[in-house]
Structure formats: C-alpha cells, structure tokens
A protein has these predicted regions:
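Membrane-embedded transmembrane alpha-helical bundles that form the catalytic cores
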Residues: 1-431, 436-481
Length: 482
C-alpha cells in the first residue's frame, strides 16, 4: 500500500478512528490494532511475505526472552548468533542469492572456465532490509544488556511491523520505539497537527519533486549515449533531487503518520544537500541507517580507535557494506567505495567536524564564501556518486561521466510531457530556496506563526501537487526496492 494512493487515504482514517475512538481505553487493544493494521498494510503488496516477517518476529522475540534469562555468556552468544544468522540468512537469500551466483559464474568465465549454476526466480520482499535491521538491533541491544527484553509479544510484533516506517524506514531502534509502544498513549492535538503538516510536506516532495523529475531522469539515463554534456549534467542533478524528494518525502510522511498515533520516530534527513563535506552529508542523509552502521558495525570493529590503518579499514567496511545494503549490484558497492574515498581525506586529517564548529562561531563574509564553495563542491561530488547509484552497470556510469567531460555540444532538450529543462531548474531553485529558509525547522518545515502565511503555504503546496500530478508516472518509492 502506497502512502500516495487512494487505498492509503481510506486506510489511514479508518485505523485512526478505531485507534482513538474505539480501543483508546485499552493499551493492549491499541497495540493489537496497530499490529493488524501493519499486517494489512504490508500484505497489500504480497500477503505471502507476511509469514516471513511473522517468523522473524517470533524468532527474535523468543531469543530476546532467552537472552534476558540466560547468564552464561557462551549460551548468550549462541542466541545472538542465531538471531544474526536467521535474519541475515533470509535477507541474503531473497536479496543476494542471484547476485552471488551470477558473480561466481562471471569470475570463472573471466579466467576462461565455463560453469553453469542456475539462478532462481526470487521476488524481493518489500522492506526486508529495513525491518531486518530493526529487529536485529533489538537482539543485539538485549545481548549487550543495553535494553531489557519485553515479554509482551503483541507489543514486540507491533514494534517490528509498525506500518508507517515498515517498508522504507526510518530504521528505528528498539530503545526508542518499543518503550513508546509499551506505554499508554493519549491523543495530542498539537502533535497530530504537526504530523499532518509533515505528511503534506512529504507528499509535496514526492509528487512535485520526485515524481515530476522521474520521467525526465529515466529518459536521460536510458538515452545518455546520444545526449550532450549539459543535458547529462542536468540528468545527474535531477536524479539527486529525485531520490532526495522521494526518500525524504517518504520519511516525512512516515514520521507524520506516526505522530497521528502518538508515536515519535527519529529524524532521517536534515537537509543533506547543504552539507559542507562528505562526513556532514552522512550525518544528514538516511540518518537511521548511517547511525545503525556506526553503532553496530563501525564501533564494534574499533571505530577510529587504534591505528590509522585500522580506522581506514573500518571506514571502507562501513561504506562498502552500506552500498551493498542498498542492492545486489556492483554499482551500489562502487557507490559505497566512492563515498569511502571521498570521506577518507577528512578522516585522515581529522577535519570531519571542523566546518560544523566554524559554522557555530558566527557570521563572517570570508567564512560564508568558503562554506558556499564547500557546499557546492560536496553536492557536486555526491551527484557524481548518484550516477553510479542510478546506472545499470559501472561501465554505463563511467561512460555517462565521460560524455559529460567530452561531449560539449549544446542542444535544446524537451521531454515529451512538454516541460523544458529550464522549467525543472526553476522548480528546483524554488525548492532549494524554501529548504534553505526552513533549514532550522526539520521537524516542522511548514509551520509558521502567522496563520495567513501557513494557509498560503498549504494552498501553494496543494496547488503545485495538483499541477504536477501525473497519473502515468510510477508512484512507488525508490527505496522500496531495497
């Protein structure tokens, strides 16, 4: 079920009404309703995969209880590794089996040996990478004794499958979400209003930014071999904003929807394209994933402690695994490697957080000019990375970038929908300018004290959504494939 669908527009008010007006006196019934609603929401895509999430829930709930009772460290490790193997085993089979088989065959072919290993027709369960990491964080935290295991199965199952963030995040920690599900909740009018505003802002980013750019991005990346440098540059920039509008829009809708049920999810984006270096970008982009890898991979590997060589190893590990998490394709692995290489200089020189401190020290014209330069440079480098993320193969990505620096002819490009590149550029300039104005309001981007300003913003956003809505565009979210 898509957030931007008629189905969800009917589903959400029904669940909201039942939650606050029918079962509001009983916490257990509220949690049971959330669980049922979440399974209906997830089963809307393919009901067969409900058994997968149910099994994962049952396994990690049981192992959490066992970890809470067991004092012997050797047995506790067995329980932890059982959780890791089961969860990553499912993820590996459904998401990476064919990739490993094809890569294995290609490796033998490269060395002149022909072998035949059949691939399987595997359907990737929606959101498996997200809920796998969410439930894994629970068993890891219980193992580390950072979290008390819950004995309330319905509440735990609702935590794993909470529908607003189930299929594309934010990837919640049990330490944040589970206590909220376990405690009594009361309706908060102000929070609900904030939630609706966030949902409106997220829908605007999805419909007006992401969906309107989607056809032209698809067209440019499909026909890049015939296009000139200016058009290819625009294609890369447009994809940068498409994926940002798509993914951050989903996160805004998810966070806003959760607010309607009295639950606060973590921020997932903090205006990442205003970052002044790659380290800052990753503190602002997909925060729930980057902090997950930091806490459960980077720090256990040693983080920045120890020798520089080990620190560099850990940096490469976290970025490459992050790339691989996104998809079973060498393009994603290369994208992760590319970001590791971009991050490495500031890591080695110890300047990762330098510009954050400079920004806090007050306004200075020279510093401001330097920060603009750093922001533009960081965005340009991130956009180069997005070419690898979007391309079908690494070879396609390199050819795309090669044409940018070698084919300089200027031609008028117009997409069949009637809009010109300049129309999209003006749209993005408006969007960037507005985001800059609200950059300190990431939890409430369209809330203004003046009610007339608020009303004007609401009307403008709805008008633009109606103007740019295209029924022929694929309305699914990009990160559903991950």
């Amino acid at each position: 079920m898509l957030f931007n669908s008629i189905d969800f527009a009917i589903f959400l008010p029904v669940v909201f009404f039942l939650y606050w007006f029918v079962v509001n006196k009983n916490l257990q019934l509220q949690n049971f309703l959330l669980l049922v609603a979440s399974y209906v929401f997830y089963g809307w895509w393919d009901w067969r995969f409900l058994s997968l999430i149910a099994f994962s829930t049952l396994v990690d709930y049981s192992l959490g209880v066992l970890l809470g009772k067991e004092e012997k460290e050797s047995k506790r490790k067995v329980y932890l590794w059982t959780s890791i193997i089961v969860n990553l085993g499912f993820l590996g089979f459904f998401k990476y089996y064919n990739f490993f088989v094809e890569s294995f065959v290609d490796a033998f072919t490269f060395f002149g040996q022909e072998i035949e290993i059949g691939t399987l027709n595997i359907i990737l369960p929606v959101g498996i990478s997200f809920y796998t990491f969410q439930t894994l964080s629970y068993t890891i935290d219980v193992y580390k004794r950072n979290l008390e295991p819950t004995k309330k199965f319905i509440a735990f199952a609702a935590f794993v499958s909470f529908f607003p963030q189930l299929v594309a995040g934010p990837i919640e920690r049990a330490s944040n979400l589970l206590p909220q599900i376990l405690k009594k909740r009361s309706f908060n009018y102000c929070e609900a209003k904030d939630g609706l505003r966030l949902m409106l802002w997220g829908l605007f980013k999805k419909v007006v930014i992401a969906d309107s750019l989607s056809p032209i991005v698809n067209d440019i990346f499909s026909n890049y071999s015939t296009l000139s440098s200016p058009v290819l540059i625009m294609g890369a920039i447009f994809f940068a904003f498409q994926i940002y509008g798509d993914f951050s829009g989903y996160s805004d809708i998810a966070i806003g929807t959760a607010k309607l049920f009295g639950i606060e999810l973590m921020s997932n984006f903090k205006f990442p394209y205003f970052s002044k270096n790659i380290g800052e970008f990753w503190r602002r982009w997909h925060i729930s994933l980057s902090t997950w890898f930091r806490d459960y991979l980077y720090i256990p590997l040693g983080g920045s402690r120890g020798s520089k060589l080990k620190g560099i190893r850990n940096v490469f590990a976290i970025f490459i695994v992050s790339g691989f998490w996104h998809g079973a394709n060498w393009t994603f692995i290369f994208w992760g490697l590319f970001h590791a290489l971009l991050f490495l200089p500031s890591f080695i020189l110890g300047t990762n957080r330098k510009y954050v401190e400079i920004a806090k020290s007050g306004f200075n014209i020279v510093t401001a000019i330097k920060n603009v330069y750093r922001t533009v440079l960081t965005f340009a480098l991130v956009t180069v990375g997005w070419v690898f993320f979007r391309a079908e193969t690494i070879s396609d990505a390199f050819t795309y970038l090669k044409r940018i620096v070698t084919v300089f002819s200027v031609g008028d490009y117009s997409h069949p929908n009637g809009y010109r590149l300049i129309d999209y550029l003006l749209l993005l300039l408006f969007f960037v300018a507005y985001e800059y104005i609200i950059r300190n309001k990431e939890r409430n981007p369209i809330s203004f004290k003046n009610k007339y300003v608020r009303l004007l913003v609401y009307i403008l956003l709805v008008f633009l959504m109606l103007l740019f809505y295209d029924d022929g565009v694929d309305r699914s979210f990009i990160y559903f494939q991950f």
